[in-house]
């Protein structure tokens, strides 16, 4: 029993009065700067929000007494007019900024480093670290499931999830009040089914925080079931979904199992299940039989329906055999291929041939999604023909070339794990010619004239390495050279996907 408590026990040091001490005192600054200068900016979000701005916003919140005292005019919507709606957004942004500090990845890692738990963290957190794991494990597994995580869920469920982390009762009352007024004012103009979509667009930071919180709760329950898979009957499976009084329920179930049930409640660890999530999808691979895989499928559906009140159909989870199925993952097209090797064996005067089948993971980069991405960013048209980038014409020649080279390096860095580099070479060619056309347009010259003046080999060396040029000129070389130039290299310093490779 103690082993289960270690896994799902809430960190009491984290479960504390969080928001009110931070909002109504200035301990937010001590908390933020006490764990290093990680709170600088959020990549991919509006960078105008900083700690200093939040301090000013909280100061302005103190001055808005009519936002805090709702009892004076209970019939009036405090978030109704535009001015008060602006201050409600201030409160919402301040809330998210404060909570992000507490839930920040660097905040947790700083605590782990003090305990010397994480030593090679920067390598493990790389999104490319999953591919070497796939190369080692995927070839021994049989089944793969594509899971589409259902969303959105009812906001009251998200408030209940926050109860596991925050003890501020007044904050939950305020959060429910905010949701009530926001959705009532929005539903007048927006259909019910589109309210969550409009909410995600108007408050992307808060929406992303709630989504990550929901996924974290769903995965924490699933990982417990994965590590300690239960042999309970289906009707008893539901009791594990509610985290409150979790351990008392386990003890109660053990008593029931020993006295009234014909079977015993036991837990076993299944080492052949692997789970990976990316964006709004997840991959579930296993070596189990099809019957056990279907059992896990309905466990997922039951979890979403009973714990999160989300109606999910069985079609949201697809079951496939790895030997007959290929799937997309983080920009790569993955499949299991059988390599046949013929070995001649001789015993005394008899010789015979032996065929050896070896499974291998294929990692292929498809060219069409990359061309669509470059076309969207105005580097080429939809057919892949390079065009100039007119918005960069006002930059200096050095800045134009540097920007194109940086994009090219990003592609090479990210997709260097591909076994076949032809798609990557085509992308480099498009970027190189787009760079030349942009420079020619800036100097009001033709491409041919500009290349004569610059030198045709000048930009070729910048965009293509020596082995790239060699493989393009001599596509059919010896097996040793092909293996040298086509080996997969996974860079373990990629912490997030660049916009120009985020095409899935």
From Swiss-Prot:
HAMAP family reported for this sequence: MatK
Q: Which function does this protein serve?
A: Usually encoded in the trnK tRNA gene intron. Probably assists in splicing its own and other chloroplast group II introns.
**Keywords assigned by UniProt?**
Chloroplast, mRNA processing, Plastid, RNA-binding, tRNA processing
InterPro entries associated with the record: Domain_X, Maturase_MatK, Maturase_MatK_N
Cellular compartment(s): Plastid, Chloroplast
Transferase in keyword set: no
Q: Which family does it belong to?
A: Belongs to the intron maturase 2 family. MatK subfamily.
Q: What is this protein called?
A: Maturase K
Q: Which GO terms describe its molecular function?
A: RNA binding
Kindly list the GO CC terms recorded for this protein. chloroplast
Name the gene. matK
What's the superkingdom here?
Answer: Eukaryota
- Which Pfam families does the annotation name? Intron_maturas2 (PF01348), MatK_N (PF01824)
Q: Which GO terms describe its biological process?
A: mRNA processing; RNA splicing; tRNA processing
């Amino acid at each position: 029993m103690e082993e289960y408590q270690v896994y799902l026990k809430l960190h009491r040091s984290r479960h504390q009065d969080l928001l009110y001490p931070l909002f109504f005192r200035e301990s937010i600054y001590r908390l933020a700067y006490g764990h290093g200068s990680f709170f600088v900016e959020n990549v991919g979000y509006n960078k105008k929000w900083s700690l200093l701005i939040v301090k000013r916003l909280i100061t302005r919140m103190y001055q808005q007494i009519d936002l805090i005292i709702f009892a004076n005019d209970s019939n009036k919507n405090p978030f109704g007019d535009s001015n008060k709606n602006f201050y409600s957004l201030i409160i919402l942004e301040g809330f998210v900024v404060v909570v992000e500090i507490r839930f920040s990845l660097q905040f947790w890692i700083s605590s782990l480093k003090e305990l010397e738990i994480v030593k090679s963290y920067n390598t493990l957190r790389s999104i490319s670290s999953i591919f070497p794991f796939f190369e080692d494990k995927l070839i021994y597994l049989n089944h793969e499931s594509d899971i589409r995580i259902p969303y959105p869920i009812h906001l009251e469920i998200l408030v209940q999830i926050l109860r596991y982390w925050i003890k501020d009762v007044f904050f939950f009352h305020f959060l429910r009040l905010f949701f009530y007024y926001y959705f009532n004012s929005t539903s007048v103009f927006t259909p019910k089914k589109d309210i969550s979509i409009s909410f995600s667009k108007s408050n992307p930071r808060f929406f992303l925080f709630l989504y990550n919180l929901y996924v974290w709760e769903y995965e924490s329950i699933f990982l417990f079931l994965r590590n300690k898979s239960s042999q309970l009957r289906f009707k008893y499976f539901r009791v594990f979904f509610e985290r409150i009084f979790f351990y008392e329920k386990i003890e109660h179930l053990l008593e029931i199992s020993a006295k009234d049930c014909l079977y015993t409640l036991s837990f076993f660890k299944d080492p052949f299940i692997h789970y990976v999530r990316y964006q709004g999808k997840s991959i579930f691979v296993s070596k189990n039989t099809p019957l056990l895989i279907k059992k896990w499928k309905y466990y997922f559906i039951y979890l979403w329906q009973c714990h999160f009140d989300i109606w999910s159909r069985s079609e949201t989870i697809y079951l496939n055999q790895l030997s007959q199925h290929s799937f997309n993952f983080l920009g790569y097209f993955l499949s299991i291929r059988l390599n046949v090797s013929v070995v001649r064996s001789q015993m005394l005067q008899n010789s015979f041939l032996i065929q050896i089948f070896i499974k291998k993971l294929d990692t292929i980069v498809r060219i069409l999604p990359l061309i669509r991405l470059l076309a969207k960013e105005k580097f080429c048209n939809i057919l892949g023909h390079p065009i100039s980038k007119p918005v960069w014409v006002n930059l200096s020649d050095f800045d134009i070339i540097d920007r194109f080279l940086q994009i090219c390096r990003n592609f090479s860095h990210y997709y260097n794990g591909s076994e076949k580099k032809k798609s990557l070479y085509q992308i480099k060619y498009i970027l190189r010619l787009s760079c030349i056309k942009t420079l020619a347009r800036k100097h009001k010259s033709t491409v041919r004239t500009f290349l004569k003046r610059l030198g045709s080999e000048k930009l070729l060396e910048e965009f293509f390495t020596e082995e790239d040029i060699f493989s393009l000129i001599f596509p059919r070389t010896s097996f040793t050279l092909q293996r040298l130039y086509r080996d997969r290299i996974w860079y373990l310093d990629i912490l997030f996907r660049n916009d120009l490779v985020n095409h899935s």
